[in-house]
Amino acid sequence: MYYADLRKYDTSNWSGINSTLFVSGCKHCCEGCWNKEAWNFKYGKPYTKEVEDLFISYIKDEHVVGACILGGEPFQQDLDIILHLVKRIKEETDKPIHMWSGYTWEELIKRDKCVDILLWVDTLVDGRFELDKRDLTLKHKGSTNQREINVQESLKRGEIILINP
């Protein structure tokens, strides 16, 4: 797995100061995507244990309120690596994890390994970016078809629970 960027202090993807990992590789190739360079699965640098340790250390910073994982497409990576990462974040920091995916909730919950990952995630912004539905006033997403899902409540209730309906 490769990553496109790693930010210790990021205020552009979620509320507050978060540490953010941008994974490389995405087959969705949404028209109007702002991060086209990250479509390439070999873009950026190799993701290593040292990179993961650094990311965890960023999240542990007292000023950081959570972790963001986006891309690229996190659910098109080696899912064992993503699962290991989200487990480590929760076990070592207990801070919220926010993930973005071009897949919908309905697509993700059909795949066991994706559900294993979601068990550790707090928020999922789901759905492909749609240029004709782009809205620059949206806070955590790029187009109106995307949803901010409370993952833990959705898993518990067996239905999608939106954060900002």
What is each PLM-predicted segment?
Residues 1-22, 27, 35-41, 160-161, ...:
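N-terminal [4Fe-4S]-dependent radical SAM core
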Residues 1-4, 17, 35-99, 103-117:
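Conserved Radical SAM active-site core
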Residues 94, 120-121, 145:
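A generic structural signal for alpha->beta connector loops
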Residues 120-130:
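Non-cysteine beta-strand/loop elements that form the S-adenosyl-L-methionine
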Residues 77-86, 134-165:
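P-loop/Walker A phosphate-binding loop and immediately adjacent motor/lid segment at beta-alpha junctions
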Residues 104-106, 129-133:
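Short Gly/Pro-enriched loop/turn and capping motifs at secondary-structure junctions
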Residues 30:
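Short cysteine-rich clusters marking metal-coordination/redox-active sites
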